[in-house]
């Protein structure tokens, strides 16, 4: 009888000690996942002053253009530069995670060689980025080396 009571008591303690709720799941931060579709990851960058991180995605033509260190994207190239605010990771000291989506910039070249630039963000009314400068910035990226 004593063994049965002891087993029940230990089981009760074990079950109740594991039911602690985690009240600060996300610390009030919203994290958005970007779906690149058929575009592949090319490179990334970090801006500590603005506390942002960016990832450059593109198709095969974009990868070829950046690998050749061209000044302009090849015909058919599509590139998207996705920028997020970053935050300290509450689960790992010294780590960062993506947070609020800041902007999605797109550069693409049509079959005639015309280069178009578009940006989606909340700040487009107050600040219009220089198209030529942004295209040069895109073309300054170097693809990460893959094993």
What do the predicted segments below correspond to?
Residues 2-8:
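Sec-dependent signal peptide recognition
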Residues 14-17:
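C-terminal motif of bacterial Sec signal peptides marking the signal peptidase cleavage site
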Residues 20-21:
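Disulfide-rich extracellular modules and peptides
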Residues 25-129:
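Extracytoplasmic c-type cytochrome modules immediately beyond a signal peptide or single-pass transmembrane anchor
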Residues 76, 106, 131-146:
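The canonical Cys-X-X-Cys-His
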């Amino acid at each position: 009888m004593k063994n049965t009571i002891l087993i029940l008591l230990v089981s009760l303690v074990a079950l109740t000690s594991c039911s602690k709720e985690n009240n600060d799941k996300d610390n009030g931060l919203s994290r958005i996942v970007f779906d690149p579709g058929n575009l592949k990851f090319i490179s990334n960058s970090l801006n500590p002053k603005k506390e942002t991180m960016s990832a450059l995605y593109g198709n095969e033509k974009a990868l070829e253009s950046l690998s050749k260190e061209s000044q302009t994207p090849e015909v058919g190239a599509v590139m998207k530069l996705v920028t997020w605010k970053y935050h300290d990771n509450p689960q790992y000291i010294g780590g960062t995670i993506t947070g609020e989506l800041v902007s999605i910039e797109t550069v693409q070249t049509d079959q005639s060689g015309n280069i178009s630039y578009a940006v989606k963000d909340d700040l487009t009314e107050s600040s219009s980025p220089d198209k030529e400068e942004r295209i040069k910035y895109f073309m300054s990226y170097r693809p990460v080396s893959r094993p």
